């Protein structure tokens, strides 16, 4: 079983979990009006380029929730790193535990913060284990995590196999500065969709990510011009785009 399926399994010493409930964050993905299907479905990006997607994975971390009184609950760091993998349905519903209350906002990072990027490998467990769950989300040559990965094919790609690969990482660097592609996502809940958790009461937050926004928004990204993007300046353009790919669909309180 993958360690990133439920934060609640990673109790943090010194925190009282007796009056806590679960919040499930349910991720779905679309390409415009179409549900995302990996493999054979053809989509068209805002540049008019046809493409197919074979992989979509990204880290979420540093999750927090804001109550109606304005106070903020930050999920303990050792319990808030997840890999969202569209090909693995079990990864699309990470679970966190929070104190009872009503929450009007949530926030999370797409990526892995600089502290965890620089910790000793022995302290990177679960979703952060570069020899396990994060094996294909880690640059061994750069000692850093891939925050967001989208791969596929397109007839306009200049690559011999017509592939495209977007592997976006970089946290600002340690001894030498780099681009910082860590992005914070802020989600506001409408009054009818406030998260209400309490004793024997859990909630599910439904979020939708539109992959077409990876190609547009602040920056126009053409597969013909940018078929492979990794640790290059164009990575910042893609990160700025996917920072706006998420919308809140609804909240259920059970």
Which sequence ranges carry the predicted segments?
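C-terminal motif of bacterial Sec signal peptides marking the signal peptidase cleavage site
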Residues: 3-6
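A short, solvent-exposed, low-complexity linear motif enriched for acidic/polar residues
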Residues: 9-254
């Amino acid at each position: 079983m993958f360690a990133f399926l439920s934060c609640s399994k990673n109790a943090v010493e010194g925190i009282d979990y007796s009056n806590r409930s679960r919040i499930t964050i349910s991720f779905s993905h679309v390409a415009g009006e179409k549900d995302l299907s990996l493999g054979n479905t053809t989509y068209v990006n805002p540049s008019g380029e046809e493409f197919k997607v074979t992989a979509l994975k990204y880290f979420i971390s540093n999750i927090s929730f804001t109550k109606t009184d304005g106070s903020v609950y930050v999920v303990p760091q050792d319990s808030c790193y997840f890999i969202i993998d569209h090909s693995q349905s079990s990864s699309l519903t990470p679970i966190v535990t929070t104190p009872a209350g009503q929450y009007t906002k949530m926030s999370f990072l797409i990526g892995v913060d600089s502290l965890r990027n620089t910790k000793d490998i022995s302290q990177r467990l679960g979703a952060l284990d570069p020899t396990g769950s994060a094996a294909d989300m880690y640059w061994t040559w750069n000692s850093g995590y891939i925050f967001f990965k989208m791969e596929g094919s397109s007839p306009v790609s200049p690559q011999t196999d017509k592939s495209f690969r977007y592997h976006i990482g970089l946290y600002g660097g340690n001894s030498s500065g780099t681009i910082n592609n860590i992005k914070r996502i802020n989600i506001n809940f409408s009054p009818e969709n406030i998260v209400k958790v309490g004793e024997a009461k859990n909630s599910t937050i439904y979020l939708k990510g539109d992959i077409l926004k990876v190609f547009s928004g602040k920056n126009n990204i053409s597969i013909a011009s940018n078929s492979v993007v990794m640790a290059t300046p164009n990575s910042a353009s893609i990160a700025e785009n996917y920072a706006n790919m998420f919308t809140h669909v609804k909240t259920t309180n059970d």
